Amino acid sequence: MKYSLLRGMQDIFSEQIYLWQHIEEHARKILENYNFQEIRTPIVENAELFLRSIGEDTDIVEKEMYVFQDKKGRKVALRPEGTASVVRAYIQHNFFNNPPPQKFYYIGPMFRYERPQKGRFRQFHQIGVECFGVSSSWIDAELIYMLKLFLEKLNINNLTYEINSLGCKRCRPQYRKVLFSFLADKVNQLCIDCKRRFEKNPLRVLDCKVPSCKESLKNTPLIVDFLCQDCKEHFLSLQKELDEMNISYAVNPKIVRGLDYYTRTVFEVTTTMLGAQNAVAAGGRYDDLVELFGGPTTPAAGFAIGMERLIEICSNSLLIKPKKPFVYVAYIGSSVEKEAKKVVNFLRNNNIPTETAYEKLSLKSQLRKADRVGANIVIIIGEDEIKKSVYIWKNMKDGSQGEASLNELLELIRRKYDTE
């Protein structure tokens, strides 16, 4: 019986994996320059963690989360996003006792049982960052600036940065009342999901992508008009910070994000290079989440980038050279196999990607194999070469060749390798 991938999953290999590695390495370099430290949390968590943080009436929890019972009857879930796990780790390991800010980043798979389509998978990958202990809008602006820096380094253009404020637990209840009254007159025009959201959490209605709902919500009261003085000043301060950083942005009062834990700042980065699924990254502030999970009151902010979306864009705009063995060691006869192994290990120990024949092949077959794997230089070892303590080298690109000792060979290869 042949087995194949489950729907919504993917294998990543060959040329594509080099692009993934390039993007991940690029992200690590930028994030670590901003003093973000990598954190790795489990894929499986207590399901209650996500029910409390994301919100029970969100699409993620109601329709998309992979939830099951383990062998002890505990309700567990495959993580649908990364923030809740990092907050749990922040509290469990007492990071709040360390001087703020505490900055973390993660790169890894998330899981949502949704309809697979272009750029959207059931196992997908995110680059995420979380910063704890800073209430200033400076960090919000810095997160957006980091995103801009990262995306532009990947040659991703046509980007739009949109921001909004969702207020706080002091000013949001008043807006909910006003929004509820507004929606009550339009509830029959809403989709089935939004009718349900209207009763449980009317703010969720603003996040609907159904055209008929979007049409009904054209004149919705705006949350920015109901912000308390502190939230208003925080939002104005964010805009000032972005102006000082020369970041072009738009205030979009309709951005609410699909997760319940956000407070104050929320933002999205979109591009015209992706069609309908145009969001590349999104994030915001979640000042109440640490306390909700049993930790001390802690301001926090973060964002997540969709890796599959980046790959879709960068596949056409970034040319990443595949990593191939730079040197192929060919040998003639079983009597020189020991010497060939010594040369292979010597080169690898000196950080030269090297391949060889693990089975007995003719020299012609070995040269053919070296060509197929893309080696730049072939080293040929025979009994005569061992007696003379030299090795034949051949440049597979221009056909030039010569003889050299092992140390001379290393210098020659290094010069060539560094210019590639």
UniProtKB/Swiss-Prot annotation:
Subcellular location per UniProt equals: Cytoplasm
Quote the NCBIfam families the UniProt record gives. hisS
Enumerate the Gene Ontology biological process terms: histidyl-tRNA aminoacylation
Phylogenetic classification of the source organism: Bacteria, Pseudomonadati, Nitrospirota, Thermodesulfovibrionia, Thermodesulfovibrionales
HAMAP family in the cross-refs: His_tRNA_synth (MF_00127)
Q: How does it assemble?
A: Homodimer.
Which Gene Ontology cellular-component terms appear in the entry? Answer: cytoplasm
Q: Does the keyword Protein biosynthesis apply?
A: yes
What are the EC numbers?
A: 6.1.1.21
Its protein name is Histidine--tRNA ligase
Q: Which family does it belong to?
A: Belongs to the class-II aminoacyl-tRNA synthetase family.
* Source organism superkingdom: Bacteria
Single GO MF annotation: histidine-tRNA ligase activity
